[in-house]
């Protein structure tokens, strides 16, 4: 299948569209700014608390007539542009595909050659998040603002979180708690160049945006600094290190056994990555607040590159650190922190290391999507953005916004399909909400069979009273997915050209598994075909599952304005009741604060990550290895991202 790299089939239509949008944009921007000036966020209200009341009134009286005058002047040009823009949308393609070719060991071509489908299985990590990148006036309804700056910041945090090396540390002694269990996959144990020194007892902590792994290097950084000298082909991000720590000497770590050569992790140049938001000034002790892009100081260990590697220590140098992989017995290596669960689960201050696939919702603003794409291309080679339709299409209502879906992948994308839900109503009908279906290649067998997986990203109808509409959309989602798999599958069943190893659905479904008003969606047949790792049954959640929708009134409270603070708050029941959104009752009663004291559960979980156990290649299975709720985007969106790591292996292989 040919992937569309431009929204229009020829340059003539593209130029005409650019001219028409240039005529519309001033009017669009003025309306957005005018409305936004009357919708302050709680953060802005606190900033203005000490200002005299007359100052705000003076600014409003002064600038409102100016905006209105400019708006009236821009209206004729906007009308002229709309006359050309609207019919052009019938020729517009439903997405734009971008590839920034990466020839490094972490690039897509190199990743395909790593796994042949033989021997041990392979894990794939998926993440989904609603990032609320709407036009600023609409974003303020969710108590977030400055969409363009947030887009840069979100991309930067995701990139730096995913680019960390995947390190797992197991502590033998229950009394040795010197290493936080808050982020079991985000600890780095630096070793000397000889690879024979013990893991240091003291650890230097750092913010996630300060860490730049090789996979997280921005394209412009590589152009400025040049490639790192002496890079080896085996230093990919897929390398992981398992460090086993004993508790015989208190907080002192034991020396790792039997170093495995070639297990490396790379640390890029220090300092702040390119693309940092200009109005975010980093300060000591400030981790992830609105005044700093720092995302956390609790769970990530920063290696001192120049000290042990013998490098020059210059800011532009890319030093490499050797990580000694201890030989751990298979039973010990697979030991889980939660014996009562088949997989590890946590509230993490970071996106998972070695993130393979990212699905985002509510990336509605085109300029924000471009900034987000620029940041994420430093880690993800393949990106689909500006997904959706505009104008009038078929029997659908007029669409002012696209679907808001955004997809990024480290693996090559083979096929893509998009469908718009035709039954949207109310304000949701103005956006072309739908489903994006993707087929990705993750490897090839020695017999040249492609190893592939299917991913569906969606965003369902939002108004809480429209359960029937969401159920219809879930029906359409299943039908479209079945058609997509049928149209993109290999023709021969006896000798297939492809092996399907995973089938994942993720996105914001706008209903939870604890509200009595959402019973219709909770019992949908989708949950019989796809497994929800957080769910026991209709209306019944697993005890460790928490809500993913934050209470927007508390987004900028000091207790939750940094990833680390939000992580700590969500690990306590009192904190969850204070800062997560809970089901709203249609019956009259107490207010939000008083009602929460009577509620049970852990909040509204409306962001889902589902995987299929059936429909995969015979003798293959996909099992959840890790599941995490992520706080790294605190202060930037009103949702918690979620991530899932699937272990794919042949059925006959024993764990």
UniProtKB/Swiss-Prot annotation:
Main location as per UniProt: Golgi
Post-translational modification summary for this protein: Palmitoylated, palmitoylation-deficient proteins are targeted for lysosomal degradation.
Tissue: In brain sections, it is restricted to neurons and especially prominent in large cells, including Purkinje cells, pyramidal cells, neurons of the dentate gyrus granular layer, and neurons in the pontine nuclei. Also present in the hypothalamic nuclei, neurons in the piriform cortex, and nuclei of the brainstem (at protein level). Mainly expressed in brain and jejunum. Weakly or not expressed in heart, spleen, lung, liver, kidney and testis.
Region (Disordered): 209-237, 250-320
Keywords associated with the record: Cell cycle, Cell membrane, Developmental protein, Golgi apparatus, Hydrolase, Lipid metabolism, Lipoprotein, Magnesium, Membrane, Metal-binding, Palmitate, Phosphoprotein, Sphingolipid metabolism
The keyword Ligase is assigned to this record: no
Cofactor: Mg(2+)
Important for substrate recognition (site feature) positions: 510
UniProt binding sites for Mg(2+): 362
Regulation of protein activity: Inhibited by nSMase inhibitor GW4869. Binding of anionic phospholipids (APLs) such as phosphatidylserine (PS) and phosphatidic acid (PA) increases enzymatic activity.
MF terms (GO), sorted A to Z: identical protein binding; metal ion binding; neutral sphingomyelin phosphodiesterase activity; phosphatidic acid binding; phosphatidylserine binding; phosphoric diester hydrolase activity; sphingomyelin phosphodiesterase activity
One CC-aspect GO term: Golgi cis cisterna
Gene3D superfamilies per the UniProt record, alphabetical: Endonuclease/exonuclease/phosphatase
Membrane topology: Lipid-anchor
Residue numbers on the Cytoplasmic membrane side: 1-10, 32-64, 86-655
Modified residue annotations for Phosphoserine: 178, 289
An example Gene Ontology biological process: chondrocyte development
Biased composition annotated in UniProt, kind: Basic and acidic residues: 211-221
Signal peptide (from-to): none
Active site, renumbered: 639
Associated pathway: Lipid metabolism; sphingolipid metabolism
UniProt keyword Transmembrane helix present: no
UniProt intramembrane annotation: 11-31, 65-85
Function per UniProt: Catalyzes the hydrolysis of sphingomyelin to form ceramide and phosphocholine. Ceramide mediates numerous cellular functions, such as apoptosis and growth arrest, and is capable of regulating these 2 cellular events independently. Also hydrolyzes sphingosylphosphocholine. Binds to anionic phospholipids (APLs) such as phosphatidylserine (PS) and phosphatidic acid (PA) that modulate enzymatic activity and subcellular location. Regulates the cell cycle by acting as a growth suppressor in confluent cells.
PANTHER family associated with the record: SPHINGOMYELIN PHOSPHODIESTERASE 3, SPHINGOMYELINASE FAMILY MEMBER
Protein name per its UniProtKB record: Sphingomyelin phosphodiesterase 3
Organism from which the protein derives: Rattus norvegicus (Rat)
